[in-house]
Amino acid sequence: MSLIVVRTHSFILFWFSCCWRVCFIQWIRKYSIPMADMGRRDSASALLDASENKNHLWG
């Protein structure tokens, strides 16, 4: 009887940890990737501004 209880609890714990991990990864992707894209966009716009300034200085 105790073996059945242990297996059931370990099975429930396994599924809970899997679901938690999937939800956590999705949360990380949802909130960290837009920040990274924003950073990339900012650096790209900074490079564009720098090239425009260089073209403006050279004529």
Swiss-Prot record:
Main location: secreted
Post-translational modification, as annotated: Contains 1 disulfide bond.
Tissues expressing this chain: Expressed by the venom gland.
GO molecular function, one term: toxin activity
Similarity-based family: Belongs to the scoloptoxin-23 family.
Compartments it resides in: Secreted
Species in which this protein is naturally found: Ethmostigmus rubripes
CC annotations in GO: extracellular region
Protein name: U-scoloptoxin(23)-Er2a
UniProt keyword list: Disulfide bond, Secreted, Signal, Toxin
